[in-house]
């Protein structure tokens, strides 16, 4: 199976890295085109476009200016260690074993507004460019139009490389929209995580994001390859709810503590 997760806004370029192994992103010629567009924006235009403060906008204007596709450890780090958010708290990549990272490199992918599709050990320079950003570019009015079928085609190539016909969608809706489902040459399964609050089960963003990371870790550590195997997930109190699940959507619930 191949699992998809979203990136994170928060980045960590300080924590000591557990490995010096790395690969280079595979869609850099496309990333460079986006950088060219972003470099033409002023800090105030970035602030407006991304709905961020002037401070964050200035930081990212500097990042766009400094970006260059010769990545090494002086200016970049592996994606799985660079992202720091709720999903990555659940994934806890720093405590994965070497064999787990090897498996993840083949079976886990991170969607990205700038890099398209990242493998865990792909080096990346710091950036902020969310997939939902309405950035006018040479291919359209937003990043979905820019990436078009490029991400989808790469996913299909990665599925073929591991001889798999199962894609596990652990990404947010914003990022998963960059994938053309109709052209994916695999069965697609989406785990959904519901937490009980005041007697009702619902998606609670913080918990759901962390649970996606926990599920990614579960897949990696157990080297899963069948949709049926996912149903055994029981980390941090979650359990599979067969009655509310379907072939395409696997529901996991957690009772209120």
Curated annotation (Swiss-Prot):
GO terms for biological process: response to hydroperoxide. One of its GO terms (cellular component) is cytosol. InterPro entries: YaaA (IPR005583). PANTHER family: PEROXIDE STRESS RESISTANCE PROTEIN YAAA, PEROXIDE STRESS RESPONSE PROTEIN YAAA. HAMAP family: UPF0246. Belongs to the UPF0246 family. This is UPF0246 protein ACICU_02469. It comes from Acinetobacter baumannii (strain ACICU). The lineage of its organism: Bacteria, Pseudomonadati, Pseudomonadota, Gammaproteobacteria, Moraxellales.
């Amino acid at each position: 199976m191949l699992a998809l997760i979203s990136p994170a806004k928060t980045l960590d370029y300080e924590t000591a890295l557990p490995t010096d192994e790395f690969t280079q992103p595979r869609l850099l010629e496309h990333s460079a085109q986006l950088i060219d567009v972003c470099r033409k924006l002023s800090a105030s235009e970035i602030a407006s476009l991304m709905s961020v403060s002037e401070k964050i906008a200035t930081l990212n204007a500097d990042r766009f200016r400094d970006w260059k596709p010769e990545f090494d450890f002086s200016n970049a780090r592996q994606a799985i260690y660079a992202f720091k958010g709720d999903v990555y708290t659940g994934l806890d990549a720093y405590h994965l074993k070497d064999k787990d990272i090897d498996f993840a490199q083949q079976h886990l992918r991170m969607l990205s507004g700038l890099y398209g599709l990242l493998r865990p050990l792909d080096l990346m320079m710091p950036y902020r460019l969310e997939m939902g950003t309405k950035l006018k570019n040479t291919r359209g009015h937003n990043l979905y139009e820019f990436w078009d079928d490029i991400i989808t085609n790469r996913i299909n190539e990665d599925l073929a490389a591991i001889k798999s016909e199962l894609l596990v969608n652990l990404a947010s809706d914003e990022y998963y929209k960059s994938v053309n489902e109709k052209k994916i040459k695999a069965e697609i399964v989406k785990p959904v995580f519901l937490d009980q609050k005041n007697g009702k089960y619902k998606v609670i963003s913080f918990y759901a994001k962390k649970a996606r990371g926990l599920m990614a870790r579960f897949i990696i550590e157990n080297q899963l390859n069948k949709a049926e195997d996912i149903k055994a997930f029981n980390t941090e109190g979650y359990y599979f709810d067969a009655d509310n699940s379907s072939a395409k959507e696997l529901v996991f619930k957690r009772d209120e503590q």
